């Protein structure tokens, strides 16, 4: 679910925190990607990119197709992705998971009715709602990434929290996900729409954590309380409080405890046994693997391994898989060259340093020409050429 209404609130009150960019502008960046979010996008995608969407046994392959071709696209644009997979959800998320199960049951009933009515649009809509990422989807995706030479991380708990930890540790530049709670976990940069297909023509939206805090007039602790008021996965929110009222309350009272002390309970209903304090702690101290101990390595692809894994029962086109493997190898080699070039890059010159360098070059040139003039003439009284 993420954080309800946060994206619009930032756009309204802190627009300077959002920047739209083309994918090519992230050349050379390492990015931690929410793998489950990607797999979900790929599973509901209507169009394939030339591969079959199911095996001979009817098992879906759109998640593998999407992972393969979108990852190649990222690498083609000079981006170094690392995929982060969800672990066990925190106990506090059980309420949200129960609600999702209820919505799934409702979608199944609605799908049955739409099928009986022959309503294709409704059938497609409810089929999408029934899509979920399984452990088998994740296992296959990890195997594919390993063959592609792309690193992945298995989070002990929430993938967004682990992504944020990698960003804060300086291992990667940003978190790429559609869930805004990556910001609540403290990711200094959030990228939305990075893994969307080129056909959708969606610019990448980059959110700056520092700028949004400044624009909203809050610190990181107050921002977490704001997100809890807006509505998160870990606890209920106060009924009747929307985004505008939530930011007003945070700006006036600075934390949920003081808000509750001053809240008109005849107007707003506070959830019984509200676990906002535990939710707050989950955002402040999430269960994550030590980011400093995680080593990220991008290696050369295993072309034959990819062909064996994707072709055959999974029915991917072998020529396209081999072509993709060659693109992976090419991007790996070009990224190595970029790193070598950047190693020798000099610092930007200041105006005074630039002028001094010019003077030194001119003096050296003049000295060389003078020396040449003295030695270039014939014997005796020959004259040298005038320095240019």
Curated annotation (Swiss-Prot):
The keyword Aminoacyl-tRNA synthetase does not apply. One of its GO terms (cellular component) is mitochondrion. Residues 1-104 are annotated as: N-domain. One of its GO terms (molecular function) is 5'-3' exonuclease activity. Keywords: DNA damage, DNA repair, DNA replication, Endonuclease, Exonuclease, Hydrolase, Magnesium, Metal-binding, Mitochondrion, Nuclease, Nucleus, Phosphoprotein. Gene3D superfamilies: 5' to 3' exonuclease, C-terminal subdomain (1.10.150.20), 5'-nuclease (3.40.50.1010). Binds 2 magnesium ions per subunit. They probably participate in the reaction catalyzed by the enzyme. May bind an additional third magnesium ion after substrate binding. Structure-specific nuclease with 5'-flap endonuclease and 5'-3' exonuclease activities involved in DNA replication and repair. During DNA replication, cleaves the 5'-overhanging flap structure that is generated by displacement synthesis when DNA polymerase encounters the 5'-end of a downstream Okazaki fragment. It enters the flap from the 5'-end and then tracks to cleave the flap base, leaving a nick for ligation. Also involved in the long patch base excision repair (LP-BER) pathway, by cleaving within the apurinic/apyrimidinic (AP) site-terminated flap. This is Flap endonuclease 1.
């Amino acid at each position: 679910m993420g954080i309800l209404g946060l994206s619009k609130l930032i756009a309204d009150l802190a627009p300077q925190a959002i920047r739209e960019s083309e994918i090519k502008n992230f050349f050379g960046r390492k990015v931690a990607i929410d793998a489950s979010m990607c797999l979900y996008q790929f599973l509901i995608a209507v169009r394939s990119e030339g591969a079959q969407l199911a095996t001979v046994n009817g098992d879906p392959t759109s998640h593998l197709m999407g992972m393969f071709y979108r990852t190649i696209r990222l690498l083609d644009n000079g981006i170094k992705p690392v995929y982060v997979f969800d672990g066990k959800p925190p106990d506090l998320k059980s309420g949200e998971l129960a609600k999702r199960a209820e919505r799934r049951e409702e979608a199944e009933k609605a799908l049955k009715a739409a099928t009986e009515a022959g309503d294709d649009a409704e059938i497609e809509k409810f089929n999408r709602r029934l899509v979920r990422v399984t452990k088998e989807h994740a296992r296959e995706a990890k195997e594919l990434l390993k063959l592609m030479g792309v690193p992945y991380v298995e989070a002990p708990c929430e993938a967004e929290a682990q992504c944020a930890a990698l960003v804060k540790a300086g291992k990667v530049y940003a978190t790429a996900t559609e869930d805004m709670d990556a910001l609540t976990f403290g990711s200094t940069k959030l990228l939305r729409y990075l893994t969307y297909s080129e056909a959708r023509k969606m610019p990448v939206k980059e959110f700056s954590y520092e700028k949004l805090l400044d624009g909203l007039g809050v610190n990181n602790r107050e921002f977490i309380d704001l997100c809890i008021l807006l509505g998160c996965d870990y606890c209920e929110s106060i009924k009747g409080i929307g985004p505008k009222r939530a930011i007003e309350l945070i700006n006036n009272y600075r934390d949920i405890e003081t808000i509750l002390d001053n809240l008109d309970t005849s107007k707003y209903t506070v959830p019984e046994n509200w676990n906002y304090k535990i939710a707050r702690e989950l955002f402040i101290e999430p269960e994550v693997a030590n980011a400093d101990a995680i080593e990220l390595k991008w290696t050369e692809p295993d072309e034959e391994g990819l062909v064996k894994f994707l072709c055959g029962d999974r029915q991917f086109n072998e020529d396209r898989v081999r072509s993709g493997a060659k693109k992976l190898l090419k991007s790996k080699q070009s990224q190595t060259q970029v790193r070598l070039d950047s190693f020798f890059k000099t610092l930007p010159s200041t105006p005074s340093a630039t002028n001094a360098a010019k003077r030194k070059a001119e003096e050296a040139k003049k000295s060389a020409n003078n020396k040449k003039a003295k030695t270039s003439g014939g014997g005796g009284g020959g004259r040298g050429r005038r320095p240019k």
